[in-house]
Structure formats: C-alpha cells, structure tokens
Swiss-Prot record:
One of its GO terms (biological process) is cell wall organization. It comes from Flavobacterium psychrophilum (strain ATCC 49511 / DSM 21280 / CIP 103535 / JIP02/86). Residues 118-317 form the ATP-grasp domain. Mg(2+) 2 binds at residues 284, 286. This is D-alanine--D-alanine ligase. The keyword Lipid metabolism does not apply. GO terms for molecular function: ATP binding; D-alanine-D-alanine ligase activity; metal ion binding. Gene3D superfamilies: 3.40.50.20, ATP-grasp fold, A domain, ATP-grasp fold, B domain. Belongs to the D-alanine--D-alanine ligase family. It catalyses: 2 D-alanine + ATP = D-alanyl-D-alanine + ADP + phosphate + H(+). The gene is ddl. It is found in: Cytoplasm. Its cofactor is Mg(2+); Mn(2+). Its EC number is 6.3.2.4. NCBIfam families: D_ala_D_alaTIGR, PRK01372.1, PRK01966.1-3.
Length: 328
C-alpha cells in the first residue's frame, strides 16, 4: 500500500507541519506500507526521496520517477492551516477519489472558522466566552467592545491556527495594534471576553469505533497566554494529567467528547478549554493537531499508553472505509 505523508501548507504553520510529518514518517509500520514524504507548499508540490524532489501531478496526485508513475492509496494529512486544515485539500482529494485521514472537507472548513464553530456549538449548550465578530473595514468602537466584553479581552483572526495573530488587550490603547496584528492573518476577526481560569487541552480521536479521550493537559504559559512562542518555543509548561479535581476532569472529558461527536469529527483532534468556576468553557478545536515532539497530542498519547503506530494504522483503516460524498 502506497501511503503519502502530506505535510507543509501555505501559512506560517508550515514549519510546524513539517515537524509533525516527520513524527508520522518515524512511526508508520514500514513492513505494512510503502511510505512517501510529500511536501505541499505554496509554490511546490513534490515527493521527497533521499533529498531529491519529484513534482506531484495535481491531476491525480501522482508522481513520476525514472519513467514510472506512482499513485497513492491513502494520504495522511498533517498539513496545518491552509490548505490542509480548512477543507481545501480534503475537497481536492474527494474529487480525485484519494482516501485521506482526519475529518472531511465540511468539518475541516467549519472548525477552522472560529465564528461558525461557536455558532454551531451554541445549539449544544457548550459554555464559551462572549464574542464579537468583525470584518476588515467595519467601524470598530473600542468603548462599545469594552462595554460588551469588559477588560481584558482577546483579539483573534477568525481563521488561523497556532495562535498566530492573537493578542490580549489589557487597555484600549492596545486595541489598534492588536487589530493590525489579527487582520494581517485574516480579513475577519473575533474579539472574545477574558476567561480567568485553568487552561487545559484535550486530545480526542475515533479509535476502533469509539470516541476516546487521550488525556487532559494543563497549560501554564510564561507569556500572557498560550501564544505561538509558548506553544513551540518552550515558553510554557504542559502538565499531563492536569491538576484539576475529579469532577472537573469528568466534565472536561464529557465536553470534549460531546463537541467531537456533535461536530461530526473523525481522526485526531485537540480541544482547548478554560475551566472557570469549575465549568469548562470551550476555546477552540484543532482538527490537525501538532505532532512534533513538543506538541501536546503525542504527549497525551504516551500518557494514555496508546501506541502511535497502532493509532496510525487505525487512521488509515478509517480513511479507507470512508467513501467520498459523491460516491454515496
């Protein structure tokens, strides 16, 4: 079976994705699969073999080496941000009938859009921060935002990952800079009220037909919040299992599973919460969580005594069992 381990992306998250892809390459069972490293970058789609690059034929996601055309039986998607986490790659693979891991194009697009995710979860009574949605060019009144949300508050790109473009605003004179920072990542932003509590992250996946919670990790950032530096440059402490009460642990696990199932997820995911007054408040869900050695999801898999090669086998089995929507 030819397996494409797809990594990279078009955003600043591509560096993290390349690290995630390496973990997958190192943990796939080479006795079961013919494994290929595939880079999808803005100006370069290619297969990398012993340092040499072979261009991907986008018509059918194949490549040619020494006159021999190789096609893939399944794609393992580790692309963070666009186009691998927002539904674009998933739609492409659906159209050319390539099975792929993770959730489908609709769930990917939905969960990459913070506003739309929050709107859907409102139906399921999931506690969350208050928020204001704005687009570039809208009239923005800092005093009205303060009145609605209080201080401090967070300014976030509506569609971005790895906390890129996120700022905490403690005073209104910081708002203009925060808006510029967020709008540099996206033309839409969310402004959210501050939740004062314990931040936790929860790995969830579909494993052998069951929705399974891997573990709950407590996040202690050296910065004001769990930003890019804290996530990837060692500016945080991540404690698994989280130092929370048994009641809180149960509530967080139940909420994470409810969100996963309510949104129709499949594959690996990571859901972030702030526990405030004993109640977990939803922050966001990541449908292509980081898999670098520094990332939370692999740490939680180790805590749960889950074998990464077996987890990847499970992902491939799920991908092969799912038919494209147009074939149903």
């Amino acid at each position: 079976m030819n397996v494409a381990v797809v990594m990279g992306g078009y955003s600043d998250e591509s560096v993290i994705s390349l690290r995630s892809g390496q973990l997958i390459l190192n943990n796939l069972d080479k006795s079961k699969y013919n494994i290929f490293e595939v880079h999808i970058l803005l100006k370069d789609w290619s297969v990398v073999i012993e340092g040499e690059k072979y261009p991907i034929n986008k018509a059918d996601f194949s490549f040619t080496k020494n006159g021999v055309i190789t096609k893939f039986d399944v794609a393992i998607n580790t692309v963070h941000g666009t186009p691998g986490e927002d539904g674009h790659l998933q739609s492409y693979w659906e159209l050319i009938d390539i099975p792929y891991t993770g959730c489908n194009f609709y769930q990917s697009a939905l969960t990459f859009n913070k506003r739309d995710t929050l709107s859907v979860l409102t139906k399921f009574n999931i506690p969350k921060a208050k928020s204001i949605y704005l687009r570039k060019g809208d009239v923005i009144d800092g005093n009205e935002i303060k009145k609605a949300l209080g201080l401090p508050f967070f300014v976030k790109p509506n569609q971005s990952g790895s906390s890129l473009g996120v700022s905490k605003v403690d005073a209104l004179d910081q708002l203009e800079k925060a808006l510029e920072f967020a709008f540099a990542e996206d033309n839409e932003i969310l402004i959210e009220s501050y939740l004062n509590g314990t931040e936790v992250s929860v790995g969830v996946l579909n494993y052998k037909g069951q929705t399974k919670v891997l573990g709950i990790t407590e996040i202690l950032s050296q910065n004001d919040f769990f930003d890019y530096e804290a996530k990837y440059l060692g500016k945080s402490e991540e404690i698994t299992p989280a130092r929370i009460s048994k009641e809180e642990e149960i509530l967080v696990a139940e909420s994470a599973k409810k969100i996963y199932n309510s949104l129709g997820m499949s594959g690996f995911s990571r859901t972030d919460f702030i526990i405030m007054n004993g109640i977990p408040h939803f922050i966001e869900i990541n449908t292509n969580p980081g898999l670098s050695p520094q990332s939370i999801f692999p740490q939680q898999a180790m805590f749960a005594k889950m074998d990464m090669p077996q987890m990847l086998d499970n992902e491939i089995t799920l991908a092969l069992s799912r038919k494209p929507i147009w074939k149903k």
